[in-house]
């Protein structure tokens, strides 16, 4: 993309940094994940967790959620102003699983938020380390993306469930900052904007007064974030129109849904980063690894390396398949929920199955589930190759359509053709002439119709051996292009209920 020079890299967003050179970025990202690791070790000490209990991904998630809740200022304020019976707004906690007499037992722990904040700051050289918190949010978001599909949420906002590949980051909290905005898919941004417009239509005061001014600024900022994800001039021009609308209403909603559909072929640029559970960083720090000195990148070989030699366990329900649970977590770690399954399979070195074929439910265990029947197993999170994560949705050939497949948003920078059923996608565009910007629409539809398969390839680097840390010898895999490669395709995954 031509505007690359003006953009901060992911890592700069992630660490809130100004312009830094590659070494400084690696060091500050290293400092961030090292802080997460130190915090995790300290929490394991506080909770008196054994080594094995500390490697349990469910315990990791509980500890991550506790620190996120301790720093959620808006919610904390709200809880203090609206006290609910039997809940202490100053405390946070969750289920911790321990091994007792050969069984896993659940124990609910409760901590002062102040105490958690103190431990977190202490692990992060006395700073709030917001970047580390955002990093944990993105890991939770990636886990949700791999576990649930958002059909119901899509239908509620008037979008088509076939757009699920555009929904990356749809469960990220609003407070996730620039790093969070970078990983949100086109569909996620469209959905946030539609919800906002609907509120404005139903509540006349939404855009008025001092609050309304702030709302308007937020609206325009979200429009600009979405505009920045589009790679063609016509899509961007349409976004300008949506942003400049005096009082956004149904015409804007129609335009946004149109743009979301167009993103199935004219893909948006969405960032991908490998965010690992806190316990993985904890294990590395405990073994004496100095992240800040060694440097770390979320989009290179480092996360693959880290997963090659960390042992993480998960609780397994009676009829779940441990290999399937491993795949789910592997996909979450690499933000690969919307990647082509053939690319993921090649990199992982094991067949990656569509969601509907997995015998596994989510990673977290509900409080009413019976612990008597729970077993645990080691997650297989290793890979055969590694590849650079991409922020591009595909390549625009001479500003023509970069096209893709109805249900893939590339995660890895690996060259492939993106097969897509143009008929399926174009069918989504028939018979809706609402919204006003007909010339831009015509232009966008023309680009989509003219996208030839060769414009539709994704030119990436290829994959690399795990010994090739400088990415010198790309291996370009050849894929059997006859198979549909998407994860949620024809699927019955559970819904994510917020």
From Swiss-Prot:
Keywords assigned by UniProt, alphabetized: Capsid protein, Helical capsid protein, Host nucleus, Host-virus interaction, Ribonucleoprotein, RNA-binding, Viral nucleoprotein, Viral penetration into host nucleus, Virion, Virus entry into host cell
Residue window of motif Unconventional nuclear localization signal: 1-18
Protein localization: Virion; Host nucleus
Keyword Transit peptide: no
Molecular function via GO: RNA binding; structural molecule activity
SUPFAM superfamilies with a match to the protein in the record: flu NP-like (SSF161003)
Region called Disordered, residue ranges: 1-21
Domain of life: Viruses
PTM comment, free text: Late in virus-infected cells, may be cleaved from a 56-kDa protein to a 53-kDa protein by a cellular caspase. This cleavage might be a marker for the onset of apoptosis in infected cells or have a specific function in virus host interaction.
Main location as per UniProt: virion
Pfam families for this protein: Flu_NP
Motif (Bipartite nuclear localization signal): 198-216
CC annotations in GO: helical viral capsid; host cell; host cell nucleus; ribonucleoprotein complex; viral nucleocapsid
GO BP, one annotated term: viral penetration into host nucleus
Record's subunit section: Homomultimerizes to form the nucleocapsid. May bind host exportin-1/XPO1. Binds to viral genomic RNA. Protein-RNA contacts are mediated by a combination of electrostatic interactions between positively charged residues and the phosphate backbone and planar interactions between aromatic side chains and bases.
Family statement: Belongs to the influenza viruses nucleoprotein family.
Function: Encapsidates the negative strand viral RNA, protecting it from nucleases. The encapsidated genomic RNA is termed the ribonucleoprotein (RNP) and serves as template for transcription and replication. The RNP needs to be localized in the host nucleus to start an infectious cycle, but is too large to diffuse through the nuclear pore complex. NP comprises at least 2 nuclear localization signals that are responsible for the active RNP import into the nucleus through cellular importin alpha/beta pathway.
Name of the molecule in the record: Nucleoprotein
Source organism of this protein record: Influenza A virus (strain A/Gull/Astrakhan/227/1984 H13N6)
Gene name in the database record: NP
């Amino acid at each position: 993309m031509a505007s690359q020079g003006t953009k901060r890299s992911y890592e700069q967003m992630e660490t809130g940094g100004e312009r830094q050179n590659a070494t400084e970025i690696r060091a500050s990202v290293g400092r961030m994940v090292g802080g997460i690791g130190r915090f995790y070790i300290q929490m394991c000490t506080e909770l008196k967790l054994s080594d094995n209990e500390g490697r349990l991904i469910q315990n990791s998630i509980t500890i991550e959620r506790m620190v996120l809740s301790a720093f959620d200022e808006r919610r904390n304020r709200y809880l203090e102003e609206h006290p609910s019976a039997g809940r202490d707004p100053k405390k946070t906690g969750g289920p911790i699983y321990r091994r007792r007499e050969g069984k896993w037992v659940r124990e609910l722990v409760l901590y002062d938020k102040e105490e958690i904040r103190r431990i977190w700051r202490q692990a992060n050289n006395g700073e709030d380390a917001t970047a580390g918190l955002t990093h944990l949010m993105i890991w939770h978001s990636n886990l949700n993306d791999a576990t649930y599909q958002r059909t119901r949420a899509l239908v509620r906002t008037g979008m088509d469930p076939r757009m699920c590949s555009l929904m990356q980051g749809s469960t990220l909290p609003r407070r996730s900052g620039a790093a969070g905005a970078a990983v949100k898919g086109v569909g996620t941004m469209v959905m946030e904007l539609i919800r906002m417009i609907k509120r404005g239509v139903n509540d006349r005061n939404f855009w008025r007064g001092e609050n309304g001014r702030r709302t308007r600024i937020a609206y325009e900022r979200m429009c600009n974030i979405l505009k920045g994800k589009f790679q063609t001039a016509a899509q961007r021009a349409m976004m300008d129109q949506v942003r400049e609308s005096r009082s956004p209403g149904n015409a804007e909603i129609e335009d946004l849904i149109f743009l979301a559909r167009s993103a199935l072929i004219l893909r948006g640029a969405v960032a991908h980063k490998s965010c690992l559970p806190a316990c993985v960083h904890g294990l590395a720090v405990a073994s004496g690894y100095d992240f800040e000195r060694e440097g770390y990148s979320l989009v290179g070989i480092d996360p693959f390396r880290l997963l090659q030699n960390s042992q993480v366990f998960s609780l397994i329900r009676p009829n779940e398949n441990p290999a399937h649970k491993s795949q789910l977590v592997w996909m979450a770690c690499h933000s690969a929920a919307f990647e082509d399954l053939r690319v993921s399979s090649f990199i992982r070195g094991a067949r990656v199955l569509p969601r509907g074929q997995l015998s596994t439910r989510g990673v977290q265990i509900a409080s009413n589930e019976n612990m008597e029947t729970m077993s645990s197993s080691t997650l297989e999170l290793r890979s055969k190759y590694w590849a650079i994560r991409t922020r591009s949705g595909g390549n625009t050939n001479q500003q023509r359509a970069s096209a893709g497949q109805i249900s893939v948003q590339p995660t890895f920078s690996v060259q492939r053709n993106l097969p897509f059923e143009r008929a399926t996608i174009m069918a989504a565009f028939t018979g809706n002439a609402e919204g006003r910007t007909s010339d831009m629409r015509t232009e966008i539809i023309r680009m989509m119709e003219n996208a030839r398969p060769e414009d539709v390839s994704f030119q990436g680097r290829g994959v690399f051996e795990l010994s090739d840390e400088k990415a010198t010898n790309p291996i370009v895999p050849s894929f059997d292009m006859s198979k549909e490669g998407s994860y949620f395709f024809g699927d019955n995954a559970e819904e994510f209920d917020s």
